[in-house]
């Protein structure tokens, strides 16, 4: 008998070895028996556009077919993929892994099932297998061709250039043109061919695996990456598109994202006929709940989208597959659906624990001409990815009419699954089909693997094209406060850049880094590297003081560039600013930027000599910094004329904004750019604040040196020079700080006129509860030297705070009301026309308010100036002076439902006002003054939550917030962590950190560990962070700074 010729399988075409299958059953369990019955042939279209035929029993569940395809491809991380097919109504649906195949695919002979990517992780570095990344790259290629992945021409050309590099290797103009002529990656490709080849020329030496990685790195930053749009209408009948992603449910208008609902804020998903319903969790301090409603084309279409949402939530948010609920004995109401398969957490854990063997494979396009690929071994560079934090939340699914809503697994429940390898024996489950396909006559054990974890919000920031995973967070996309709070806005994010609760406009919780931190493998330091680091650099305190000058100077230069480069460039493109104002701003900032560029260069050269990186033979004479500081501080005195102009610049810019709607819109839009990570007018104060930092550094250096030290004389002279400069400019700086703060608060408030008037000074802002007819209601209070405002956070597109009322301080009295009203930490503020009752969250908080309000009352008594009309539309107040009834106020603005078209707030969500609202705390002007003094920049290592890896980040601490960058060269932060409300401690022995110079940040359930490089830097980080995490006492503030004259 002649032997039957063996056709290559889909896996062998990719070069994969036959896989016996990997068992993921618990110990003692047996694989399910394959249901008997007639075999049916199913045609599967692979991602490389080839077709394979599989034969499965009619009654076999969908999981048997899915596992057969994964085994056929030798695909370990098969859980990211799914089988998609058109149902009897020609609607594309996913194969249900629990239902019999025949009940879903009713006419298998006439249906082609597509094997495609179903779950797109926030960061492709979480994909451990090169084969998996290759299949993801094929999906990107397919989405480009089909018009699903939309982007600008430059991004499109860059994506295609990496595909071409992966397929044919290094650039050759003739071969490139021939290849592009034969292969159409997008419609109308001809217009981009020159740009594609221009990018391809830069990829010389890049292996196919690296090209795949870079392709996914670029693709994941695109807004439409992994997005499948589902047409719908909102309550007003406006046509929109819904989509689901790893972060939550997204709303699009066309191809533009206009809103997003993070999983952490979604309480329940359901559908009722054609209506898709999203029930949001209420805010912490309010009882109302939002329910958003969308109308879809049909009940089947609506149910299909609901099932996809359930699967995405379970895969990305749960720790383990949800357990099936017992079926009701008599009646069942509504639809029920359960996610079947491994969650991403389980996939990550399995791969991390080494529950698979690396598979070498060859690609469909193997004729490549890469310099490196001729000798390179199969890429293992992305084999391990450090863990990020992973969170789950209680979440209900169900038809709105059913009582059996499926609850998610308990938050925080860790899976400890024992996985057993079945060995390398040949699996009997896959046999050759007479129709040149594969048939299944035995149970196929799913080749499900797990990869390590980090469900991070995808970040839309630009990053260097390297292996950069995405909070915080929050970290997020847009900076949403995710608590490191590293998103939302958004945060990243985030990746899990979200390290803590999001303080986004919608309070979308992910975690507190605003946008996701990166889990780049290249960020992890080994112990050997640490030892080299310790041996290489000096250890004396003076060196680290000098290094602090350099690190903070880098940040100061970046802040200057926001004005001299980014703002100036934007202004030049828009005709919105008078020439006189342009000249005033840039003629006084450009000399500063030029001077400090040279200053930084000198400092870095001195540090290089000190460290022995150059001219080591003369190193001994350069272990000092005082002479460099003295020379440059004397040079700064020549620039004092420009510093005096900054008060005028700030005033004229705000006047211009007040008088020109066009300039106001321009500045507001500029503040939304990622590079403008603080309010615009804050950058105008940076030069004066920098002088104060020089003074502090020189004081620290002089205190460290003994009088006979070679550097002491120059250091003391430099301190005298900078002290003289500060004395001249200090009064001007105090006025500018108050003026800037009033204008910043003005942007956060609506319903108020004349907030900024001569003589008015800001004292404190914060969250208090106000007693009204509906009970205690959270309100935001703003205390000035003549008036007290109370507001609520509105649901407007700008996310501002709406003013409800104001109390003049003249004649006001404060009464303790805890016993009268039975509310802890409660007091009555009794004004001449109105009285209100307020309560704080803690005794310390109410004491700070009492102290500051009493001080403000005393100041108001001394002033004879009347309080001007503040509210834009003040209703008549008929209350008598002695009336003590609780003030009634409308809650309509709080309970108004939002529509799907309400864009995520263009207003920055991580301002101090919003952080205080979410953290239920307060800050004073003295706290702001202390924050100005306590600014720091430098490298820190952040510990990954569930591994021993440490990630190196460039961190800038300013304005009560840590901003995280990949390196000091980045133009904008990737994530942020507001620290108000956090506690700062040193890890205990039980936390098993086992490293020096580690500090711990903790807020509720959010914990982060950071590690400094030396004892000095550790103490400095502890000092500056403690200024934000600790309540600022007035006595401490006055010891640091001259009292503010109100």
Curated annotation (Swiss-Prot):
> Which ranges are annotated Basic and acidic residues under compositional bias?
413-424
List all disulphide bridges recorded for this chain. Answer: none
Compartment list: Cell membrane; Synapse; Synapse, Synaptosome; Cytoplasm, Cytosol
Task: Identify the stretch(es) annotated as Disordered.
Answer: 374-522, 864-907
Where does the FERM domain start and stop, copy by copy? 40-320
* Classification via Pfam families: FA, FERM_C, FERM_M, FERM_N, PH, RhoGEF, SOS1_NGEF_PH
GO CC annotation terms, alphabetical:
cytoplasmic side of plasma membrane; cytoskeleton; cytosol; dendrite; dendritic spine; filopodium
Task: Please list the residue ranges that the record marks as compositionally biased, kind Polar residues.
Answer: 458-513
Q: Which GO terms describe its biological process?
A: dendrite morphogenesis; synapse assembly
Which keywords has UniProt assigned to this entry? Answer: Cell membrane, Cell projection, Cytoplasm, Developmental protein, Guanine-nucleotide releasing factor, Membrane, Repeat, Synapse, Synaptosome
Q: What tissues is it present in?
A: Detected in lateral motor column motor neurons and in preganglionic autonomic motor neurons of the column of Terni in the embryonic spinal cord (at protein level).
Q: Explain what induces or represses this protein's expression.
A: Up-regulated by retinol.
- Topology of the protein relative to the lipid bilayer: Peripheral membrane protein
Going by the entry's taxonomy, the superkingdom of the source organism is recorded as Eukaryota
| Function field | Functions as a guanine nucleotide exchange factor for RAC1. Plays a role in semaphorin signaling via its interaction with PLXNA4. Plays a role in the assembly and disassembly of dendritic filopodia, the formation of dendritic spines, regulation of dendrite length and ultimately the formation of synapses.
Q: What is known of its domains?
A: Intramolecular interaction between the DH domain and the PH domains can stabilize the protein in an autoinhibited conformation.
Q: Summarize the subunit comment.
A: Interacts with PLXNA4.
How is this protein named in the record?
FERM, ARHGEF and pleckstrin domain-containing protein 1
Gene that encodes it: FARP1
